[in-house]
Amino acid sequence: MKTMKPSASEFVTLRGLRHHVRTWGSASAKVKAPRAPRLFLLHGWMDISASFQFLVDSFQQDWHVIALDWRGFGQSEQRNEPYWFPDYLGDLDVLLDHYSPDEPACLVGHSMGGNVACLYAGVRPQRVSKLITLEGFGMKESDPTLAPARVAKWLDQLKTTPSFRDYANRDEFIQRLLQDNPRLKPEQAVFLMENFSVENEDRNEEKQGSLEKRDKRLGYDADPYHKLTNPVPYHLDEAKVFWRAITAPVLWVAAQDSFIMKAFKGYEADYAARQACYRNLQTAMLEDSGHMMHHDQPQKLAALIEGFLLAQGSDSVSDPMSDTND
């Protein structure tokens, strides 16, 4: 793997919780093109800020990149109790006040991070100058008839202590990462293991009449309470109201082979209706990429992001359901 751009870690208290914030570049970094402020990268569910390393390494400009670990992920403080989606918007609001109090921000959000960014940009349109959503396209409309069962499942989950699977050693953790994403390069998997695993010392277990301390095992550095079912249903019509309120130019990036795009097969009208909510939209499709596009195609994704951020403005919209790239 080529030499990685160095990052620095900071810890900032956001709404009472200690958050880890990873930065690349300097606060005074400037680009030649106008309207290129600091760049905020927002990771998805079960991911971390370090996951953007490959994307940052592919940028050609000297950005001041700011990426937090969302609450309960990575090195940010864990609640050890259920998480609520609106809290991410509150955390982002304070994060921008801290790092970019006097100018609107450029936001890049992947998956859950993209959904947070798109809602936030509708609530605080004056705080966002440009928005890039990497398959943060909203979720499936909740079936109201399943609401009682959904809440019942959540109540049952509250009676147990959640946990993630752990792994015997580094190699086993790496193999799981490679299994989850066949496009992941071995050196990428090693980097992710080093940044997203934590040692869990097993409790003493009785073995053949004596207590024997087992070796430490590796687990995900995330709060298992993130696994709990969200008892609050998702209302697509409400999300669309947020999206329609966005004033910033938006780049909508899809990955050709992702489970997100596969889920929209046969639902092209729904897909188009979501896109139609954005008043200033450009789209792009990444070929030979799954959902983790910042791992699968970091160079191509970096080129898309920088091309969009540094452009003087464009109203063109391409069809991401086609096989052509923007």
Please place each PLM-identified region on the residue numbering.
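Conserved hydrolase catalytic core segment
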Residues: E103-A147
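Alpha/beta-hydrolase
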Residues: A168-M261
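Alpha/beta-hydrolase fold catalytic core
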Residues: M1-L39, Q60-W63, Y99-E103, G138, ...
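Post-His helix in hydrolase/transferase enzymes
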Residues: H295-G307
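Conserved HGGG/HGGXW glycine-rich cap/lid loop of the alpha/beta-hydrolase fold
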Residues: T23-Q78
